[in-house]
Amino acid sequence: MTEPTVPSAGAPVDVEGEEQRPFSEHPGMARAYPGGRMTVGAITPLEGFDGPVPSLAGHMERIQQAERAGFASVWVRDVPLLDPSFGDTGQVFDPWVYLGQLTARTTSITLGTASIVMPLRHPLHTAKAAASVDQLSGGRLLLGVATGDRPVEFPAFGQDLEGRATRFRQALAYFRVVLEHRFPHVDSPLGRMAGTDLLPKPVYQRIPVLMTGHGRQDVRWIADHTDGWLYYTPPLQQQAANIARWRELTQGDGGAFKPYAQATYLDLTEDPLALPRPIHQGFSVGRVSLLGMMRTWQEIGVDQLMINFKHSRRPVADVIDELAEHVLPHFPPGRVGARGEHERPAGRAGP
């Protein structure tokens, strides 16, 4: 297998896509999803906080700490408006501006969105921003996409809430064609193009697109039109069934590996022996039981555990240090120079 390479910092920038690298060599995918084993990602902001708005104290330092600690990826949120009833504003800052900062302040960690609300943004704006981050980061971007689950946002943007599933499909198709073709002809309900092109093009043949939840789409459609699935933390048996179905639908794509990731809220307790206690979409647990849970998730086929620290009662800097010493060495990121661990190792259970 050809080894993936990150573009040289001294090379000309191929903004027109004349020398795009194969998608199979994508370094963002390689680090986040080596295949056959689980990695760990972090969802911004990396802090525990009450209420909907984080303090953002040391927010960039925590991400840099996570990169040094061995997190495979960091995921930024797209929350344009504060809805007090929803209780979460993500990292507050615009995701594309924040990712621009992250391209300059990190070196190797995969940069993801979890997720861009496609119906609320014109696909040309999304494509331009995504390709720009992709180029500036050396191909580290993974685009998590969503239909949108906050009803208050749609009328604010002049959008019909009930039509968001259709608009999502239209936006994703538009996004794909303008990034994957030169001077494309576009005739979409969202716009028309002829005789013009969108630059820059991505570093690799395409930007990986990962679906968040179902997005009011059929699972088969998700399997056919995206490169992976970001899901929540249902009971173990349900998650195993979800993954089995996902593998069934994606295993025929010419051997292409399409990862399945799980987002989980974590409150890592001071007591390393504390047994797991359910919290909102996650667990309060000591590191010993956490390690056992993570091994079980890996066995059923979870390709990445995406940790949300919002409910952490301890300083997240301390939590990251503890994970770095006792947990992350068991789930290291993929090596950018050695993608292709997609064959499940002997002894791995699950689908």
Where are these regions (language model features)?
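Active-site-adjacent structural elements that line small-molecule/cofactor binding pockets in enzymes
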Residues: 1-351
